[in-house]
Amino acid sequence: MSTAKLVKSAPSELLYTRNDLDDSVKTSTIALLNQLVVDFIDLSLITKQAHWNMRGANFIAVHEMLDGFRTSIIDHQDTIAERVVQIGGVALGTVQIVGKQTSLKSYPTTIHSVQDHLKALAERYAIVANNVRQAIGKTEDEASADILTAASRDLDQFLWFIESNIE
């Protein structure tokens, strides 16, 4: 099959799929999901940055907790990115795109205490959790909403755990 048959003609730029969602639903859902792919990639990297660089009371408990969070975030990120492709989009997750489009403030690299990291993480986890909840309400694709609902449950739990460790 030629490439021309795989790509619909402009302006929609959707890849061919037999998925019968309306093209406008696909396009709007792809935009929502790709923003979340960016945010999840950034959140996973921020989580690892904190994991590597914290010191102080409760270090090992928080250090290990963050490893589990990151694994789950990466799993959700993968599911969201794959949904983009399933409905005819291109998942956008390069470091250049993440750097330009993330919803998150730059993570401070000059903090070291567990408490400072927890506060910085709580702020960023809340942003992503809230963005996911908003996207659930905006998408007209039930399968995407279901994927986001699962991610929302985990992010809310992670935020709760982080906030519960802040003194």
UniProtKB/Swiss-Prot annotation:
It holds the Pfam family Ferritin. InterPro entries: DPS_DNA-bd, DPS_DNA-bd_CS, Dps_gammaproteobac, Ferritin-like, Ferritin-like_SF, Ferritin_DPS_dom. Its EC number is 1.16.-.-. GO terms for molecular function: DNA binding; ferric iron binding; oxidoreductase activity, acting on metal ions. Fe cation binds at residues 51, 78, 82. It catalyses: 2 Fe(2+) + H2O2 + 2 H(+) = 2 Fe(3+) + 2 H2O. Its main location: cytoplasm. Coiled coil: none annotated. It is found in: Cytoplasm. CDD domains: DPS. GO terms for cellular component: cytoplasm. During stationary phase, binds the chromosome non-specifically, forming a highly ordered and stable dps-DNA co-crystal within which chromosomal DNA is condensed and protected from diverse damages. It protects DNA from oxidative damage by sequestering intracellular Fe(2+) ion and storing it in the form of Fe(3+) oxyhydroxide mineral, which can be released after reduction. One hydrogen peroxide oxidizes two Fe(2+) ions, which prevents hydroxyl radical production by the Fenton reaction. Belongs to the Dps family. Homododecamer. The 12 subunits form a hollow sphere into which the mineral iron core of up to 500 Fe(3+) can be deposited. This is DNA protection during starvation protein.
